[in-house]
Amino acid sequence: MSDAAALRQRSPLVLADLLPGALVRDTLLVVGAAGFIGLLAQISIHLSFTPVPITGQTLGVLLAGTALGWRRAGAALVLYAVAGLAGVPWFAGQASGYVGASFGYVLGFIAAAILCGFLAERGADRSVLRSVPAMVAGEVVIYAFGVTWLALDLHLNAAQALSEGFTPFVAGDAIKAAIAAGLLPAAWWLTGYRRNQTTPPAGEAG
């Protein structure tokens, strides 16, 4: 590429182009991921025997973590939690504020997104065989926070906490983990990147 062509390519067309591209991109990804998880939270089924609803959030958390990397995913889930506490009605069932016994799962989402992002940055999302353990690890972290918080908030023993905060959800979350473990490697394949490649192919670098 000639110097003149490179200059034209870098020249800003609108005011937004004056901002660093990475900052604009990352901000949009963080806000978009938080909104996506808030949308999935509205896929909500309440059960009579537990204060914790069945939602689609877990799938969004796993996808955000592996697709965005740990920094952006962590920021997205912190935004989701803080905005929800501040009044944005995007917790399950359009709830906002402190959601009591189920809030541990929200904290678990942050930790799980960071963990999945950390693993993805080391290639865990490039094949199904490597994605499955990463997704399972994310699920374990969510349950560790969620069930512990549930037990402390409602003064439950371990068996009660597991029966209300783990057993009703494990089958559905296993399906979500399997979906996420399949989608990420498929996305890499569709982009044309090699399985173990971590930089763009020649000619595609910015």
Predicted regions located by residue number:
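Interfacial aromatic-anchored transmembrane helix boundaries in multi-pass membrane proteins
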Residues: 42-53, 81-112
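Short helix-perturbing small/polar motifs within transmembrane alpha-helices
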Residues: 3-19, 39, 96, 102-151
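Membrane-embedded alpha-helical hairpins and interfacial helices in multi-pass inner-membrane proteins
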Residues: 50, 122-204
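Interfacial loop-to-helix junctions that mark the boundaries of transmembrane helices
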Residues: 19-24, 48-55, 96-104, 132-133, ...
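Residue-level recognition of membrane-helix boundary sites in multi-pass small-molecule transporters
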Residues: 71-72, 103, 130, 160
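Hydrophobic/aromatic positions within or immediately flanking transmembrane alpha-helices
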Residues: 74-77, 162
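Hydrophobic transmembrane alpha-helices
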Residues: 2-74
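Alpha-helical transmembrane segments in multi-pass membrane proteins
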Residues: 29-40, 61, 65, 76-84, ...
